[in-house]
Every structure is written in C-alpha cells, then in structure tokens.
C-alpha cells in the first residue's frame, strides 16, 4: 500500500512532468513558428509568379524536422493566411486599372470636346506609364493587363475617328463667279464683242433690254445697254450685267441658227422677234468698205443733194443698193450740218424777190456780188468828191467891185444863170437803179451857191 501510495504520487508527479515537458516543447514549436513565420512572409514575395498557388509544404517540413514527435495539426493552418490578402489586393489592382482606364477615357472625351481634331496619343502615353508606375503590384501579373491595354489601344484608335465628324467644317472662301471678269480689259473686250454680235444678229439696244426683261423679270432700258457698250457704267454694275448679257447673246445666237432652217409653222406664222416678241427686228447694218466710202465722199463734195437718178447711177457704179446710197447721203448731210452749220445754208438772193437790207452786206451794181460796208462807203466818198470838184469849176468865181464904174455893186449870185444841172431826188436807198448806176446821194449841203464860205478848196477843172 505504501508502494502503491508512493507509486501514485509518482505517477501524478510524472504527469505534471510530462505536461511540463510538453509545455517546454510547445514554446519551442511556437518559437519555430514565430521564427519561420517571417520566412514564409519573405518567401511569398519571391514566389511572385503564382500568388494564387501558395504551397505550405516548406514550413510544414521544417516543423516536422525540428520536432518529429510533435503534433503537426495545429501548425498547418497558419501558413495559408498570408496568401488570402493577395486575392483582395489583386482585385483592388484590377479595379484600380479599370478606374485608370475610365479616367483616361474621360480625359480623352474632354479633350475631344474642348479641342476637336487634335491627336490624343501623347496624353495617353503619359497616362499609361504613370498608371504602371503607381501600381507596381500589377507587374507580377502581366496577363491581367493585356486586355485593358488592348481595349485602351482600341479606344485610342477609334475615338479620334469618332471625333472626326464632330469637327466643325472649315470656313471655305466663297467661290468666285465663273463668269466674273478679273479685270477691265476683259470687260472691254466683251463689250466690243457684244456690240458686234448684236448688230450682226440685227437687234437694237432696246430689243436687248426688252428681251432681258422678259427673261429675268427686270426691264433694262436702252440707255443701260448703250452705257454698257460704251463702258460708261461702274465696274460693279458691269460685272453684274455681263453674265446676263452673255446668256442672252448665246440664246439669241442659238435661236438665229435654229431660225435659219425655216419650218412650216414659221412660214405660216407671222414674224416674231426674240422670245415671242412682235417682230421688231431691223435690217442688218450695212458695212461700207473704205474705197466705197471715199467715192461717196467725192460725190458728196460735188453734189450734196443728188437726185434720184443720180443716186441710182452712183449705186450702179459702186455695186450698192440704191436705198443704202440714199440713206448714206441723208446721214452725211446731217453730219455736215452738225460740223459746219453756217455753210449748210448760204444766203443767195432769189431773182424774183427784192433783197432785204442787211447792215453787213451792200449789193452794188445789180447785186452781182456782195461788198462789205467799208468798201461801199469808200467808193461813195470818191464819187462825191469827184462830183463836188466838177461843180466848183463850173461856177464863176466871185469878183470884187472894179474901177471905172463908180463903185457899183456886183449883181447877186442868184441873177447869174447857173449851169449846174438840177440835182436828182435825194434818197438814202441803196437799191440799184435799172440803168446800173450808183445810188444818188443828196448834195444839198455841198452846193457852192451858198456863198464863199466853202470848207474845201475846189480843184481846178481840167477838161
């Protein structure tokens, strides 16, 4: 009993000893796990290629090698714990990459709205390295980044294309009118050509104005067409009129070509002008050659108003129409009146009517010619002087009382018979006498019978 009682305490004593031994062994195991825990943490970053397949064999073998007699069950669960935080970290990285891609897309869209048409690849290149540098945890998983990079590259290539239609169209310069002339020389050339072709077609300037009013709804006056042909309009107005006149000219020429082949309807219908207007077409203008014009000028200098027979003769000589020659002479006479209006109507006395008195003209001796007033007065003064000298010599000179007679007075002059012919009737008319003699002028004031108080010395008579 004593032995049994002694044995019991020994057994009891042994159990605490074994418990103490186990407690002593367990701290070593805890220290091993504590010592190996950081190693596992250090080894996990080294095995970066496969973060999802973490093998706990290394730590478990260590624990078994250090304490093969110890129980390995409680030491196995701690190693998988460090692998669990990597899964949320990878998910965070994926979400971070998606956020970076969304931010990049927003930036690209903002740039598209603000600055359309610019290339967006340089800011994307700056964004990608920054995202890669700010997320170093994404480097051990390159396969996870292939899809976002491809989608971002596709966005880079597709978004500028989508932005192309949104670009505002460039302000194009207004196209210049194809018929607008560039300078004044072209306008001058067109004005000359237009006038020649209009005359060739037989249209007047008024016809052109009416036809253009019929076509374009705005009547142009004959003055406007005339000023256009004479280049008397402003450059702007001529530029506006040029395409309209050119279109009318082309239409008129086309119509004249078509009308050169008469149809039955045209033969039966009355003559119509351009665009259905009543026939106002005139005869084509006749162009007279230079040699014919010289011949007509010579004929005009010879006779300004030929008769009908003379006009017919001139037309046969020049191989022209009689009406053309007649119109030319009429126009030439009008031109002569404008150039020299005085020579057109010479003042010739008619044989049956008495000539009217003019202060500038005097008709001596039958009115054969005209003499100026100064020449007529000089001839009259010469005649008066001759007559007065002849009268003075015919009268006897006054004699004083002589001797031997007792101082008798001389007889009066009126008792002496006068041999002076009676003066004709005095008149101031300058009309010629029927005998063609000079006009008689009263010489009553020059009569020598008035006494000795003469105001001239009579010349001696020389028979």
From Swiss-Prot:
Comp. bias regions, Polar residues: 41-60
Feature: DNA-binding region: 281-340
Main localization category: cytoplasm
Residue span, POU-specific domain: 179-253
Biased composition (Gly residues): 400-409
UniProt keyword list: Activator, Cytoplasm, DNA-binding, Homeobox, Nucleus, Transcription, Transcription regulation
Entry GO terms, CC: cytoplasm; nucleoplasm; nucleus
Residue stretches of biased makeup (Pro residues): 75-85
Disruption phenotype: Mutants show normal development of germinal center B cells when infected by influenza virus.
UniProt xrefs under PANTHER family: POU DOMAIN (PTHR11636), POU DOMAIN, CLASS 2, TRANSCRIPTION FACTOR 2 (PTHR11636:SF46)
Biological function: Transcription factor that specifically binds to the octamer motif (5'-ATTTGCAT-3'). Regulates IL6 expression in B cells with POU2AF1. Regulates transcription in a number of tissues in addition to activating immunoglobulin gene expression. Modulates transcription transactivation by NR3C1, AR and PGR.
Family: Belongs to the POU transcription factor family. Class-2 subfamily.
Protein's name in the database: POU domain, class 2, transcription factor 2
Origin species: Mus musculus (Mouse)
């Amino acid at each position: 009993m004593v032995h049994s009682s002694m044995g019991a305490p020994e057994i009891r004593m042994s159990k605490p000893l074994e418990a103490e031994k186990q407690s002593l062994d367990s701290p070593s195991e805890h220290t091993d796990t504590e010592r190996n825990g950081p190693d596992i943490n250090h080894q996990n970053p080294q095995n970066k290629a496969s973060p999802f397949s973490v093998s706990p064999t290394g730590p478990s073998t260590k624990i078994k090698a250090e304490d093969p007699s110890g129980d390995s069950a409680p030491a196995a669960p701690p190693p998988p714990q460090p692998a669990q935080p990597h899964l949320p970290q990878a998910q965070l990285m994926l979400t971070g990459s998606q956020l970076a891609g969304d931010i990049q897309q927003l930036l690209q869209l903002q740039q598209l709205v603000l600055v359309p048409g610019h290339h967006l690849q340089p800011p994307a290149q700056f964004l990608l390295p920054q995202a890669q540098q700010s997320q170093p945890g994404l480097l051990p998983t390159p396969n996870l980044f292939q899809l976002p990079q491809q989608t971002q590259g596709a966005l880079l290539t597709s978004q500028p294309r989508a932005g192309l239609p949104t670009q505002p169209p460039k302000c194009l310069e207004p196209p210049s009118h194809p018929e607008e002339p560039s300078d004044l020389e072209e306008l001058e050339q067109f004005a000359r050509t237009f006038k020649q072709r209009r005359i060739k077609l037989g249209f007047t300037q008024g016809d052109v104005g009416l036809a253009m009013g019929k076509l374009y709804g705005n009547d142009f006056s004959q003055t406007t067409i005339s000023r256009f042909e004479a280049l008397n309009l402003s450059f702007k107005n001529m530029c506006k009129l040029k395409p309209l006149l050119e279109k009318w000219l082309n239409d008129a020429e086309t119509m004249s070509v078509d009308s050169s082949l008469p149809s039955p309807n045209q033969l039966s219908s009355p003559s119509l002008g351009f665009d259905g207007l009543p026939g106002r077409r005139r005869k084509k203008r006749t162009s007279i050659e230079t040699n014919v014009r010289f011949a007509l000028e010579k004929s005009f200098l010879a006779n300004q108003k030929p008769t009908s027979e003379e006009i017919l003769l001139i037309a046969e000589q020049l191989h022209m129409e009689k009406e053309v020659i007649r119109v030319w002479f009429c126009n030439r006479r009008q031109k002569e009146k404008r150039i020299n209006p005085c020579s057109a109507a010479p003042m010739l006395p008619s044989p049956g009517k008495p000539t009217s008195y003019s202060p500038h003209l005097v008709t001596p001796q039958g009115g054969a010619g005209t003499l100026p007033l100064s020449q007529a007065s000089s001839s009259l003064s010469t005649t008066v002087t001759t007559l007065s000298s002849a009268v003075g010599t015919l009268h006897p000179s006054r004699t004083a009382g002589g001797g031997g007679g007792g101082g008798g007075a001389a007889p009066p002059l009126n008792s002496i018979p006068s041999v002076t012919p009676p003066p004709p009737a005095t008149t101031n008319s300058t009309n010629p006498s029927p005998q063609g003699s000079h006009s008689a002028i009263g010489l009553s004031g020059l009569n020598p019978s008035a006494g000795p108080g003469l105001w001239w010395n009579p010349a001696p008579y020389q028979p």
